[in-house]
UniProtKB/Swiss-Prot annotation:
The keyword Phosphoprotein does not apply. Belongs to the triosephosphate isomerase family. Pathway: Carbohydrate biosynthesis; gluconeogenesis; Carbohydrate degradation; glycolysis; D-glyceraldehyde 3-phosphate from glycerone phosphate: step 1/1. This is Triosephosphate isomerase. It is found in: Cytoplasm. Substrate binds at residues 10-12, 173, 211, 232-233. It holds the Pfam family TIM. Its EC number is 5.3.1.1. One of its GO terms (cellular component) is cytosol. The active site is at residues 99, 167. It is an enzyme of class 5 (isomerase).
Length: 251
């Protein structure tokens, strides 16, 4: 896992039962990709459907991922919340933490994200922390400062396995992609920060996210310190998603 390329698809608020089943059945002919860890992050209501399909149809070749988790560690009067323990019950393996859309629409910042990280680790799941700067922050030359602040929640966590997705906010769903030089700079910086915060013996995966598609995936995977991709809209298409997986396998 920690020496593979990761390709994680984030469906966001998309999917229907019948459409999900159709996509899962297409994945039965998924090309061989031993060098790639593949995951799909579905809306919470479809996680059990996804997990069952992974077991029955795909022999666990694709991991089940959740898009979010509650900040509250225990069961209780938190209407609408889903705990890390509940996600574990659905067969979830990886949980996205801190996606920019959570910050944008729900005001989630470092303190909440740290609590979510701890909750996920406490039940044995893998958190995938999302970080990224806005266009205004990049134009002001503050991208390193912003990312360092977001990564600071990793300090002191009880884990030696760290997964981060770098998603420049200005490239999410916009069709814009950071240049190879920008991606290389930020991924090298993120590696350096993680080693500083968590120690030299930590295992690291740093994914790139931000309009990753079949036609640019190979170039992105060739960038130093890019360990995979967090894929948005392209993960809803079998052809696009498998093309990205193949690019990772061949990187």
């Amino acid at each position: 896992m920690w020496d593979q390329k990761w390709v994680i698809g984030n469906w966001k608020m998309n999917g229907r039962l019948q459409n999900n089943n159709s996509l899962m059945h297409r994945f039965r002919i998924l090309p061989t990709a031993e060098r790639v860890l593949i995951g799909l992050a579905a809306p919470t209501v479809y996680l059990l459907q996804l997990h069952n399909a992974m077991q029955i149809v795909l022999n666990n070749r694709i991991l089940t991922c959740a898009q979010d988790v509650s900040r509250f560690p225990d069961n209780g009067a938190y209407t609408g919340e889903v705990s890390a323990e509940m996600l574990a019950d659905t067969g979830t393996d990886i949980v996205l933490i801190g996606h920019s859309e959570r910050s944008l629409y729900f005001g989630e910042k470092n303190e909440i994200q740290r609590r979510k990280m701890e909750n996920v680790l406490n039940v044995g799941l893998i958190p995938l922390l999302c970080v990224g700067e806005s266009l205004e922050e990049r134009e002001a030359g503050k991208e390193h400062e912003v990312i360092a602040h977001q990564l600071s929640i990793l300090q002191g966590l009880d884990t030696k396995n760290i997964a981060v997705a770098y998603e420049p906010v200005w490239a999410i769903g916009t069709g814009k992609v950071a240049t190879v030089e920008q991606i290389a700079d930020m991924h090298a910086f993120i590696y350096k920060e993680i080693l500083s915060l968590c120690g030299s013996d930590v295992k690291i995966r740093v994914l790139y996210g931000g309009s990753v598609k079949a036609d640019n995936a190979a170039d992105i995977f060739a960038v130093p310190y890019v360990d995979g991709a967090l894929v948005g809209g392209a993960s809803l298409s079998y052809d696009s998603f498998t093309a990205i997986i193949s690019a990772a396998q061949n990187a």
